[in-house]
Amino acid sequence: METTFGILTSGTLKQSEIARSLKEPCRLHHTQKRISRMLAKHDEVSWTAEQLQLQQIAPLVTEDMILAIDPGDLNRDGAPKSELRGRVRDGDKGDIVGGYPLLSVVARDVKRGSTFPLITRLLSPNRAGYRSENRDILTVMEEVQRHLKAKPLWVIDRGGDRGNLWKAWIENDRNVLVRAANQRYWLWRNTQKTAQQIARELPLKHRGSLRRGQEKEVPFGITRVALREYPDRPLWMVVVRHGKREPLVLVTTRPVRGRRQGERLIHSYLDRWACEEGYRFTKQGFDLEGVQARRFTTLQNLVALASLAWALLASYQEEGGKLLEKARRQKSRKSPTFPFYSLLAGWQHLFSAARVIFHPWLRRRRHSGATAPPPPDLFADAPGLLGAMR
């Protein structure tokens, strides 16, 4: 808990800054050494953080939300001695660099504009037991779905248009929305055509907005297709002409009947940007790529704790007026589209004047023999350290 709190109060994943922000009345080196030892030798920290995050955030997920799942990357090209480092594609520059794959799932409420991070996992193709990226994606989806009561729509970019993934989704009856990658033939009207061939021939009978609240409308069409491997399992394709060179082609397992449902699917796909923005927030807001640790366990634990810290901010995004006020960054009174940078700045400002945070009870326990108090529940739905802020 204290490491997560240190991440929030320091705004970084650097262990020296985390230790400094905890303000323990002992040498900084001792605090940093204790945190470093805990992160390096206890690989169960990442699993525990994931479970806590899912237990707190999963009950907030409803049928109307979307779950954006997106493979990302952690660039470690400047740290060649990092343990189990592999080769990944840098999403910012497009280069192949040394680093680790990231996998994140974010719940997005399209109507209210709220974002809830569910899980972020650091992976490595060089780790023991690695099978494939497809297996990693399915494992994360299964872990998240295990904590959910609802069956929301999973949204993934064109990297998810893979035969093994479609096989698992269809056989497990998942609600998914995937952007077609134009690398396969679909069964369509007694023919076999690629996604772009269908897009050129399909009449676009409907009109709707690309994003919720926009007035400008674009033409789109809806048709039924199937995979060659599963000809009896219908899928629905939505083709959108939005001014770019190639039409946007979306395929879903969820039935699409009429203009309104088609428009809602378009909104759902374009709102998956929240997952990409989440990666950017983890890298910039918490300075993930500036971490100097080399052990894979340490990096894995820090990524999981950063995701937990983001989830804690998310639990206050609708009632975090005091945190936003502390940030003093918003020139407009309108609610920010992605409020977590401001919430993080407000959190740092809120505790910047504190002398000590967690240490006093340790001193009382040593002198009086008292037992340690239970750790406070920092999430907004339970009375805890920040419950009075609500």
Model-found features: residue ranges?
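Single, function-defining residue in the core of a domain
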Residues: M1-T12, S21-E24, T31, E50, ...
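Active-site-proximal, Lys/Arg-enriched surface segment
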Residues: T4-F5, Q32-R112, T223-V225
